[in-house]
Amino acid sequence: MTMLPSKARVLHRLLQFRSTCFGSPSCGKAASSRLVLGIETSCDETGAAVLDETGEILGESLHSQKVVHLRTGGVIPMVAQQLHRENIERVVQEALERSNVDPSQLSAVATTVKPGLALSLGIGLKFSQKFVRQHNKPFIPIHHMEAHALTVRMLQPVAFPFLVLLVSGGHSLLAVARGVDDFLLLGRTLDEAPGDTLDKVARRLSLIKHPQCSTLSGGQAIELLAKDGDRTRFRFTTPMGQTYDCCFSFAGLRNQVTMAIMKKEAEEGIEQGTLLSCVNDIAAATQHTVATHLAKRTHRAILFCKANGLLPSSSPTLVLSGGVASNQYIRKALSIITEATGLQLLCPPAKFCTDNGVMIAWNGVERLREGKGILPPSVDVCYEPKAPLGVDMTAEVKAAAIRLQSIRMKIPN
């Protein structure tokens, strides 16, 4: 990839671009209409959407690769890349057509450039840079997790600062959102993300062979079967019980579950790949332990924020977002914590929790309003498969060593 030019060259180009574009009649219409095209290709969803400055979705399109990856047992980066390559032009064109917007009317194009699968990010970035250069439009590089965190502000007025828990198949983090591009990172996953854990457990249980789960993702299958399961039949240990910070770990839990599955397979005299009779109970116990772990770390984050004045004293808010936030059991677990600590829990609707072009466009709108991170089309941008969010405060949280009072996690299915 071409490296970013020097700051001086970028500044010169930006000033030159603003004087030539925003001052010209052809760009005046686009600037006044304030329309943003958002493009998302960070993993296995090809998404595009056009939003106006109020957050109204004028048009959107989404191509999901879920069915393909279900057959292969997980996301294969080269397969995801090829599917993005085959669909991105159509998806963007559909979003524009459904919004009745011509590229000349756009104020900017916002695209996910970090973090995510390198091969997937590359497709979205390459397409976007060609598009903005062809139509002479400003480019807004987007941090995928920032977009998830800010989605709720598109749906209702949520003032900064607020606490956000972002949980998905690839990420898990706790942060204080203090502004559109101002975050304090309180905790992150040390190994794998909760969505990844649920997917791997589902694959180990061969849930794709279950008649109710053949078309569901791993996380969806776990949630469905858990409704009829008895979580008390398997007592999995909640991770990191003696580590008093806000970071997450799910690999150890997955190992516990794998050992329990192997034991039951031996007891029932079946081979791996055959459905266990107790599959609902294992699903329920796994889901409960994931939910409890997320809830406890979030509880500590709330106490840390209160002790350090990081949240407003009146109507403090926890935002829960990301693909795993669609899980209703996990939402209920978090609601127990927010009720006990006096916070308001806000969750975007499930369709906005998973990856989509709408959230990227909205992040672009927020940045456009504040004039932050807006680049002229000629600037080369690199994608970043790994990219932390905000200022890392995890060491300070660990040093505080906040111990939790017990809160009973009685969560109805």
Annotate each PLM feature.
Residues 27-34, 141-163, 363:
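Conserved phosphate-binding catalytic cores of ATP/NTP-utilizing and phosphoryl-transfer enzymes
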Residues 314-334:
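Glycine-rich phosphate-binding loops at beta-strand->alpha-helix junctions
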Residues 141-142, 317-318, 335-360, 377:
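Conserved phosphate-binding/catalytic loops in two-lobed NTP-binding clefts
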Residues 1-33:
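N-terminal mitochondrial targeting presequence
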Residues 29-34, 42, 49, 59-60, ...:
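A short helix-loop
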Residues 33-107, 111-115, 144, 148:
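N-terminal beta-alpha supersecondary unit
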Residues 242, 247, 251, 260, ...:
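Adenine-nucleotide phosphate-binding core of ATP-dependent small-molecule kinases
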Residues 114-120, 126-128, 133-157, 176-177:
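Active-site neighborhood for divalent-cation/phosphate handling
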